[in-house]
Amino acid sequence: MIEPLLCGIVLGLIPVTLTGLFVAAWNQYRRGSAL
C-alpha cells in the first residue's frame, strides 16, 4: 500500500533530482570546454 503523499513526494523528487544531475553535468562540461 503506497500512500498518496509518499507517491507524490517521490514523483516530485524525481524531476528535481534529474534536473540537478543535468545541471551538474552541464556545469562540468562547460568548465571542461572553457579550459
From Swiss-Prot:
The chain crosses the membrane at residues 5-25. It holds the Pfam family PetG. Keywords: Electron transport, Membrane, Organellar chromatophore, Photosynthesis, Plastid, Thylakoid, Transmembrane, Transmembrane helix, Transport. GO terms for molecular function: electron transporter, transferring electrons within cytochrome b6/f complex of photosystem II activity. GO terms for biological process: cytochrome complex assembly; photosynthesis. The 4 large subunits of the cytochrome b6-f complex are cytochrome b6, subunit IV (17 kDa polypeptide, PetD), cytochrome f and the Rieske protein, while the 4 small subunits are PetG, PetL, PetM and PetN. The complex functions as a dimer. This is Cytochrome b6-f complex subunit 5.
